[in-house]
Amino acid sequence: MLLNWQGRHFMEINHSRITSYEIADYMIRTKSLLSAKELAAILEKEYPHLDVDKRDVYLRLKAIAVSKYSSVLIDDSTRPRRFQIHSLNPEFFRRSRAPRRFDEKLQNELYMTQDEKERREHQPWVMARQLFNKVARQHRHYGNATSARI
């Protein structure tokens, strides 16, 4: 299943490296069984304005292949592996661009600097020491008061 040209236009404006969209688009159009090296060479000619790296193409092909939104034939009998993409649900692309939804507490922790994280981890120890010192002071104060009464 191919995406419409509007999605492609959006993708071309916002990047300079090859994306999964261009890889899937070409593979679905041609229905060919290709290795990452062969595909990278073809994509360099198809998209001269984009940076095409063989390793990047291979990693993106693997990501598409293991996705539950794709139908991909992988030929493991040869090295390098060869891939043939039969179909790809647009949900694959929507999932990768969707904003991550984290709990607010976890989101704050993700945005903390290392110093803030260390202070936050150290805070219970500081509170425990203050509580222990307070209890010890009260014990000394009341301990002296009871011994003076006896």
Swiss-Prot record:
It comes from the Viruses. GO terms for molecular function: DNA binding. Coiled coil: none annotated. Transmembrane segments: none annotated. GO terms for biological process: biosynthetic process. The keyword Transcription regulation applies. InterPro entries: ADC_synthase. Keywords: Activator, DNA-binding, Late protein, Transcription, Transcription regulation. The keyword Transcription regulation applies. Trans-activating factor involved in the late regulation of the P1 lytic growth cycle. May be the transcriptional activator of all late P1 functions. This is Late promoter-activating protein. The gene is lpa.
